[in-house]
């Protein structure tokens, strides 16, 4: 049995890059669900007195990522222009026989997002960061930063 799927996580990593992500979606429902993840993240941030636009860290600023849109475009570019966003997965929702490119609504934290992907059935995790933070997971045979 050979299943090929890829998932991207972190709603907060894509604030401001939604047009690029939604350029190729199979339905209005997928686009709507993706935008709901963004709105929920922004609403939660606002409840805590924080703006989703203020997400970049000190390390991001140091490396020239001065606003969330610039940072988000870097995350979004992990998807090629031709790649279709097949759908939205809830945190740790099983991928099962689904193929293609999926977005998982995870917390904006390295270890929590990787745990959700592993619980969904991912067996290889390639995690790229600008600051070189390294995360690993005991249930994934290969987990490395790019």
Predicted segments — roles?
Residues 1-5, 9-146:
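Anaerobic metallocofactor- and corrinoid-dependent redox/one-carbon enzyme cores
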């Amino acid at each position: 049995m050979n299943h090929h799927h890829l998932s991207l996580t972190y709603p907060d990593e894509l604030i401001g890059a939604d047009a690029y992500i939604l350029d190729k979606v199979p339905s209005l429902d997928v686009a709507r669900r993706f935008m709901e993840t963004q709105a929920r993240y922004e609403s939660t941030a606002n409840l805590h007195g924080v703006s989703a636009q203020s997400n970049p860290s000190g390390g991001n600023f140091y490396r020239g990522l001065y606003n969330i849109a610039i940072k988000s475009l870097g995350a979004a570019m992990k998807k090629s222009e031709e790649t279709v966003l097949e759908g939205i997965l809830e945190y740790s929702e099983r991928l099962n026989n689904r193929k293609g490119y999926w977005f998982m609504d995870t917390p904006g934290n390295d270890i929590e997002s990787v745990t959700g992907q592993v619980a969904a059935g991912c067996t290889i995790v390639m995690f790229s960061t600008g600051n070189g933070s390294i995360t690993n997971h005991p249930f994934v045979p290969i987990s490395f930063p790019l």
